[in-house]
Regions:
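Sec-dependent N-terminal signal peptides
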Residues: 4-14
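N-terminal signal peptide c-region/cleavage motif recognized by signal peptidases
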Residues: 15-19
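Mature extracellular/passenger domains of Gram-negative fimbrial/pilin and adhesin proteins
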Residues: 21-300
Length: 300
């Protein structure tokens, strides 16, 4: 009789233990499962500009969770908690997190609303992160493997059993996250000029999340009084007496002079720039020519 009682006691304890751990999350990319604790989540960033905010990452396809109770009889209540914030190169930025139909400021100073989970299959968390747009068409470089955010999550079930999760979000690719209300087609453009005295169009466009009156100006080291010829910075076998000049529809564009683009919306607008050689002082000698020219966008 004592053996039978001991067997029943073991079965009852096992049953209680299974009910208590009635919630599991999974990192979809690695397959790692967990009932509490922290995990590193590597995501491919494909940011895009929006009205007043720019999407950084949609985590709904990266982290999935499910209810482990029989038929979802025990209800799991999930919410994000204080301390969730951007990290790494994005740490200085503010933004927002979308969670289950509501949006909260980042960094979070309080807890979010509760998301109820009764489904017993893995489903993505309704979770997206945004940067607050500042300026025109700026951006911040994110390197592969760099931490971009930490999200804190709390779970409690209808029968108790609270647990905490920490999602450390890392970039899985090199990308420039737009920080302004507009974005450009490329942020590092190499224009290869044919032999002197040729020219080449600069393939750069800009678009905005909503109509903006936009302009831009060029910057770099110039060698003439008009600030229109950019210096040759070639490090080896540099040509002499030659620099690079930028024109727009046939007119020279000096450095630090704002060029008005007019209204720019969701359709890309070409900057209309062409790179060409320009004579400086002294005798022209053959060699390499290289100039580094910045483009800064401004609202007008």
């Amino acid at each position: 009789m004592k053996k039978i009682i001991a067997l029943f006691t073991t079965l009852l304890l096992m049953g209680w233990s299974l009910d208590a751990a009635a919630f599991t999350c999974k990192v979809n990319d690695t397959g790692q499962t967990m009932t509490s604790g922290s995990a590193n989540v590597y995501v491919n960033l494909t940011p895009s500009v929006g009205v007043g905010q720019n999407l950084v990452v949609d985590l709904s396809s990266s982290v999935s969770c499910k209810n482990d109770s029989s038929g979802g009889s025990i209800i799991d209540y999930i919410n994000l908690t204080s301390g969730s914030a951007f990290g790494g190169a994005l740490a200085a930025f503010t933004g927002s997190v979308y969670w289950a139909g509501n949006t909260y400021p980042l960094p979070m100073n309080g807890n979010s609303s509760v998301y109820t989970i009764t489904h017993t299959d893995y489903r993505g968390l309704p979770l997206r992160m945004y940067l607050t747009a500042t300026g025109a068409a700026g951006g911040v470089v994110i390197n592969s493997g760099e931490l971009i955010a930490q999200l804190n999550m709390h779970k409690v079930a209808s029968d108790g059993n609270p647990n905490n999760f920490i999602w450390n979000i890392y970039a899985n690719n090199n990308v420039v996250v737009p920080t302004g209300g507009c974005d450009v087609s490329a942020r590092d453009v190499t224009v290869t000029l044919p032999d002197y005295p040729s020219s080449m169009a600069v393939p750069v466009t800009v678009h905005c999340a909503q109509n903006q009156n936009l302009g831009y100006y060029l910057s770099g080291t110039t060698v003439d009084a008009a600030n229109s010829i950019f210096s040759n910075t070639a490090s080896s076998s540099a040509a002499q007496g030659i620099g690079v000049q930028m024109t727009r529809y046939g007119s020279v564009v000096p450095a630090n002079n704002t060029v008005a683009l007019g209204t720019v919306g969701t359709s890309p607008v070409n900057l209309g720039l062409t790179a060409t050689y320009a004579r400086t002082s002294g005798q022209v000698t053959a060699g390499n020519v290289q100039s580094i020219i910045g483009v800064t966008f401004v609202y007008q």
